[in-house]
Regions:
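Bacterial N-terminal signal peptides that target proteins for export
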Residues: 2-14
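Bacterial N-terminal signal peptides
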Residues: 11-24
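A short helix->beta-strand "capping" segment at the edge of beta-propeller domains
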Residues: 37-59, 229
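Beta-rich, blade/repeat-based domains predominating
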Residues: 57-74, 100-121, 126, 143-171, ...
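Beta-propeller domains
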Residues: 76-96
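A short loop-to-beta-strand structural motif that recurs across blades of beta-propeller domains
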Residues: 84-86, 126-128, 173-175, 214-216, ...
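Short loop/turn segments that connect beta-strands within beta-propeller blades
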Residues: 88-92, 131-135, 177-181, 220-224, ...
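Beta-propeller fold detector
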Residues: 95-99, 138-142, 185-188, 227-233, ...
Length: 321
């Protein structure tokens, strides 16, 4: 069929109007979805109920970390393959952030108040420093006498403490790393040291021993040394992994093998236990707009899960200062 000019113009107008109409409809649907998502964000979420944040198997079975930056992004090691760090938004969108140098495999991650990322590199016997803007990775500290630096915590003066287990001998030790990269051995003859955290006032270091199921406290001296070691809790079963404080000083401890996170007072009183949708939670951090979202790395399903808490995390609070 041959169209006359007038007919061609008429059909062009109809086609244009139809296209614009469909485009407008699509935009309306997208806007409606955004409004629904915003409404869901404003709706109060139940406390201490875990839900998935990322899809299963986006990380390896070595998923660990995790830590939040000032913008609310969550970082965890071993995204898609070993020796990487992944970045996850608070809506669960995950992507590769950086590849670590050859011979390095990350474990615990911490941020300084200045926004520096520090990573425990257990295969390279290093503590790495990552520039968030440039993604440049450098070695802050290297110590051949480290078994395998596992987790990190940061004190108010900016110095780091690293746990250092020897899984074969079921022993462990603790190291202090100053801001210039100087390394000092601060505790020996311990069990398999793993999760550790500094109290809100900066005067106490907590550390757990995975195999022995102990949680210890040390007094931190003015020079950063550790003294007055004391047992605050011994558990009867299952192992430990990562550990973090909220602003009140309560400890959140991942129970590896039990599939829970325990909330415990500094005196060792168990306040509650939260199931986390997998049997092998490896670590925990706090973030979200109000600091009241806990993010847990979960090894069984190789993903991050999240749950709401009643008080902000300590690391989040430090971002606000």
């Amino acid at each position: 069929m041959i169209m006359r000019p007038k007919n061609c113009l008429r059909w062009l107008v109809i086609l244009l109007v139809g296209t614009l109409g469909w485009s407008g409809f699509s935009m309306a649907v997208a806007a409606d979805k955004e409004e629904q998502a915003a409404a869901a964000d404003k709706k109060p979420q139940p406390l201490f109920v875990a839900t998935p944040l990322t899809e299963k198997n986006q990380f390896t079975a070595g998923i660990e970390g995790p830590a939040c930056d000032a913008a609310g992004n969550i970082y965890a090691v071993n995204f898609a393959r070993q020796s990487t760090i992944g970045q996850v938004t608070d809506r669960g969108a995950a992507k590769l952030f950086v590849n670590l140098p050859a011979g390095s495999t990350g474990n615990g991650i911490r941020f300084s108040r200045q926004g520096e990322m520090f990573v425990a590199d257990y295969t390279g016997h290093n503590v790495l420093r990552v520039d968030i803007k440039t993604k440049k990775v450098t070695v802050l500290a290297h110590e051949e006498k480290m078994n395998q630096p596992n987790d990190l915590t940061i004190s108010p003066d900016g110095s780091l403490y690293a746990s250092d287990p020897n899984w074969g001998q079921r022993t462990g030790q603790l190291w202090r790393i100053d801001r210039q990269g100087g390394v000092t051995l601060v505790a020996t003859k311990m069990g398999t040291t793993n999760g550790l955290e500094v109290s809100p006032d900066g005067k106490t270091l907590y550390v757990n021993e995975s195999v022995q199921r102990n949680v210890w406290a040390f007094t931190i001296t003015a020079k950063g040394q550790l003294q007055e070691k004391r047992l605050i809790k011994k558990f009867p079963d299952h192992g430990f992994d990562g550990m973090r404080c909220d602003v009140d000083g309560n400890l959140y401890i991942t129970r590896h093998g039990k599939g829970t996170v325990v909330k415990m007072t500094p005196a060792g009183k168990i306040l509650r236990e939260i199931p986390v949708l997998g049997s092998r939670p490896s670590n925990i951090c706090f973030g979200g707009p109000d600091g009241c979202t806990a993010y847990v790395t979960e090894m069984e399903h190789r993903r991050l899960v999240q749950f709401r808490v009643d008080r902000p995390g300590l690391a989040w609070q430090r971002w606000q200062k």
